[in-house]
Every structure is written in structure tokens, then in C-alpha cells.
Amino acid sequence: MSLQFLTGRSGAGKTTWLLNEIRGKLREKPDRSPIIYLVPEQMTFMSEYKLASTPGLNGTIAAQVYSFTRLAWRVLQETGGSSRTHLSSVGMNMMITKILEEKKEELKLFHRSAGKTGFIGNMEQMLIELKRYCITPEEMKSITSEKLAVEADQSLKDKLHDLEIVYGSLEQALAGKYIDSEDYLTLLAQKIPQSAYLQDAEVYIDGFYSLTPQEL
């Protein structure tokens, strides 16, 4: 397995080069092993159109356009793990609200802010960032312990304390029953060795300005 980088400034033609590379391989051998074109969610439709509308290609079954989430769903359907109920942003907000109510006696700061406009949404974004940067509840607990030992700012101490409680409680509530959008990528990483679809696939990654540690 080799890794190649195509570099250049914005507008230099990197996407055109990649698409032409994929088209050439499809023309050469239409029944070839899978080609995966991995792009940001907002690029999937246009990328699919560009491939499907290529003159001379009789279908694009061998080449598929995916976002990270769509690829995760495809692999989980093959290997198992897609049976858990997907938790939308609304569902996540409801679960966070429930946790804040149930844990209000343990919380030092968040219980006073739970009713404020936008707080639950901000809380969700904080939890999403923790997952994207591969920080587990256990690591969060370790970080909190270190900060509590040296940090003088009581407000920050209280925030870290409460965030640790909410994050740990959320993961316990999700375990085995629900899956949120960020967890799809974690499961994808675990299932890659079991996927026959990915075994001989060629993967092209395009359109990302940056990648989170979870995506990497």
C-alpha cells in the first residue's frame, strides 16, 4: 500500500487531475476493484455528478463518492455495527438536558446555566470537539485531575469538573444503544480490518482544508 500526495495552490487543478485519474482507471478496467473518492459532505453531490456525467463511462459502479460518515455507514452495513439507533442533534440536546437534570446535585456550575438560551447547543459542540480530537472520558478525567491540582481559576476548575461528569454520563447513555455522528468514524476505524470492500480499494481524498485527529 502506497501513499501519494498531490499538492498545489487553490485553483491549481488538483481536483481535475484526480477526477481524470479515476476516469482513466475506470476506462482501462471497468470491473476493477473499488475506487473510493472521499470528499467533504457538501461536495458529494457535485462530485458524483462529475463522475456520472463523464462521456464514455458505462456507469460508475466501481467508483463511489463518499463523505467520512457515508463511508462509515457503508462499512458498518457490511461488517456489522449499524444496528444502533442514530442520535440526531436534537436527540443529543435532549440527552444532555436529561443528564444535567439528573446530575444537578453533582454539578458545580452547569446546572445554573442549563436553562439559558444556547447553552445546550454550546455543550453539544464541546462534546463533539472532544470526540473529534479523540479525547475519551477517561482522558478527560485525567486532564481534569491535572488541572485541578495546579489551576488557580476556580471557574475553570468547576467547568472542567462538570464537563467530565456530563461527558462520562453521555457515553454511558449511548453505549450499545445509540450512535451519534462522531461515533461513526470511531467505529469505521475499528471495522476497517474486517471490511472486504476496503481490502483492495484505492482511496482518493480531496477537498478538505483540514482533517481532525479522528478523521486522520
Each language-model region and where it sits:
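Short N-terminal helix/helix-N-cap motif within the alpha/beta-hydrolase-1
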Residues: 47, 213-216
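Short, well-ordered loop/turn elements at secondary-structure boundaries
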Residues: 1, 31-33, 60, 198-200
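Conserved protein kinase catalytic core
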Residues: 73, 212-213
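Hydrophobic helix-cap positions at the C-terminus of alpha-helices
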Residues: 21, 25, 29, 99, ...
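Accessory N-terminal region flanking or inserted into the helicase ATPase core
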Residues: 2-5, 14, 102-207, 213-214
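Catalytic acidic motif of RecA-like/P-loop NTPases
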Residues: 43, 209-210
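Conserved P-loop NTPase-based nucleic-acid remodeling module centered on helicase motor cores
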Residues: 32-142
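Glycine-rich P-loop/Walker A and Walker A-like loops and their local beta1-loop-alpha1 context
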Residues: 2-52
